[in-house]
C-alpha cells in the first residue's frame, strides 16, 4: 500500500516544509509527497502557470531527492472549477446542459485548451517526479451543475455521432 501526502507548493518556509516532510517520511506517515499544482488557466492569453510552479517544485524536489524521499505532483483544477474567477477567454467554457449557463470550467474538447494542458503536463514531466496524480476534474456529468457540457464543441461532436445537423 502507498500512502500519499498532499503538500501545498508554497514559496515561503521551504526549509520548514522540507523538514516536516522528512519527519513525516521517517515516522511512516506517508511514503510519497505530492506537491499540489493548480493549473486552471488564468489570464488572456493564458499565463504559463506550470513554468512558475515547476521552478518552485524543482527546489523541493532537489532537497527531497537528496534525502531519498519520493515526491511528485498533484495536478489540481486543470480544467478549472466554478469558484475560480479568472479572465481566460481563449478557451471554450463548459456550458450547462440544463440551463445553458457558461461556467468558469474549460471544455476538454477545445484544441487550444488541450495544447495549454499538454504544455503544462510536459513541463511537469520534464521535472521527473516520482509520481503524477491527476485530480478528478474530468467529472463532466454527475458532479457538475448542469449535468453535462452542451458547448458548441460538444454539440458538434454529439451531432456527428447522431449523424444530425
Each predicted region: which residue ranges?
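Hydrophobic faces of well-ordered beta-strands that scaffold small-molecule active sites
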Residues: 2-6, 32-35, 71-75, 132-134
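Catalytic domains of carbohydrate-active enzymes, especially glycoside hydrolases
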Residues: 14-42, 123-131
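Alpha-helical scaffolding segments of alpha/beta enzyme cores, especially the outer helices
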Residues: 19, 23, 55-66, 115, ...
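Active-site-adjacent "subsite" loops/lids of carbohydrate-active enzymes
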Residues: 72-127, 136, 140-165
Amino acid at each position: 500500500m502507498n500512502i500519499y501526502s498532499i503538500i501545498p507548493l508554497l514559496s515561503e518556509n521551504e526549509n520548514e516544509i522540507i523538514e516536516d516532510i522528512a519527519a513525516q517520511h521517517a515516522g511512516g506517515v506517508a511514503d510519497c509527497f505530492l506537491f499540489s499544482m493548480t493549473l486552471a488557466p488564468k489570464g488572456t492569453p493564458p499565463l504559463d502557470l506550470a513554468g512558475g510552479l515547476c521552478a518552485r517544485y524543482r527546489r523541493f524536489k532537489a532537497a527531497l531527492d537528496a534525502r531519498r524521499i519520493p515526491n511528485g505532483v498533484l495536478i489540481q483544477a486543470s480544467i478549472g472549477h466554478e469558484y475560480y474567477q479568472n479572465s481566460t477567454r481563449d478557451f471554450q467554457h463548459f456550458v450547462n446542459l440544463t440551463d445553458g449557463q457558461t461556467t468558469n470550467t474549460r471544455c476538454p474538447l477545445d484544441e487550444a485548451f488541450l495544447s495549454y494542458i499538454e504544455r503544462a503536463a510536459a513541463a511537469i514531466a520534464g521535472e521527473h517526479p516520482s509520481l503524477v496524480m491527476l485530480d478528478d476534474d474530468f467529472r463532466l456529468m454527475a458532479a457538475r451543475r448542469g449535468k453535462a457540457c452542451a458547448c458548441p464543441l460538444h454539440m458538434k461532436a454529439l451531432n456527428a455521432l447522431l449523424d444530425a445537423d
